[in-house]
UniProtKB/Swiss-Prot annotation:
Residues 25-134 are annotated as: Disordered. Keywords: Host cytoplasm, Host nucleus, Host-virus interaction, Ribonucleoprotein, RNA-binding, Transport, Viral movement protein. This is Long-distance movement protein. Changing residue 152 to A: Increases nucleoplasmic accumulation. It comes from Groundnut rosette virus (strain MC1). One of its GO terms (biological process) is transport of virus in host, cell to cell. The lineage of its organism: Viruses, Riboviria, Orthornavirae, Kitrinoviricota, Tolucaviricetes. A motif (Nuclear localization signal) lies at residues 108-122. Homooligomer. Interacts with host FIB2; this interaction, is required for ORF3 protein transiting through host Cajal body and nucleolus, relocalization of fibrillarin to the cytoplasm, and in presence of viral RNA, leads to the formation of stable RNPs. Its main location: host cell. It is found in: Host cytoplasm; Host nucleus, Host nucleolus. GO terms for cellular component: host cell cytoplasm; host cell nucleolus; ribonucleoprotein complex. The keyword RNA-binding applies. GO terms for molecular function: RNA binding. InterPro entries: Umbravirus_LDM (IPR006902).
Amino acid sequence: MDTTPASRGQWPVGIMSSVINVFASGKSCNSGGAPRSSVRRGHRAGAARDKSRGFDAPPRRPKGGVHPATTSKDPNKDIRGPPAPTPHKKYRGPAIPGEGRSGVHTTRPRRRAGRSGGMDPRQLVAQPQQRWAKTEIPTERRAEIDGLLPSLLNTLDGQIQGDAALLRYCVGAIKRELRRRWESVQPAHHVAASSGKPSPQLFNEAAQNAEDLSGDGKGCAGQSVQQEVLHSGSGVPPVCADCGKPAANKW
């Protein structure tokens, strides 16, 4: 028969205290959850990884002790000073002047004079004289032109060939206009030349032209006595081809 304390149900004091400590430690582990394993599982296992509770190292800094973003690329920056600020873009305002101002037109500030001459840009520049301004023709020159036109018209009238009724009508109209001017202006042979004496050329041409334009075409020099009556439509009256006067209709 065993007579040891364990057989009698009595445990030594040291053994009992160790058993109690083991039981207490196991209970604390069960209350905190599953016991942690020293072996790390893979990411595919789905278990939470043990994070190292080591000391977080501060971010590395360059050896110079200054962040590279704060260093100046231009060594002369401190000498020249800070850069000038960028000017603010002015607002142009509405496209139509005075729009959105409730009908109040403010005075526009006076512009500064430009570099060239210091003249106000609003000052009007003198316009050059017009070269095509109307000029008065001297009486002597007008008489000379009137003396040359009838002979030119007679030459043109003699060169007209074929059915050119409209051209003949225009020539006759010019001759009639010359006749009216001869009646209102003094004859060319009465006009003195620049030297103060009548010009013989003007006198001869005036006498010949007066003979050509007088009468009803019967005294035309170098032209046939027969009158040619022209018709160029209902709106144009019949005109004599030689003297330019309206002629009676023979039809």
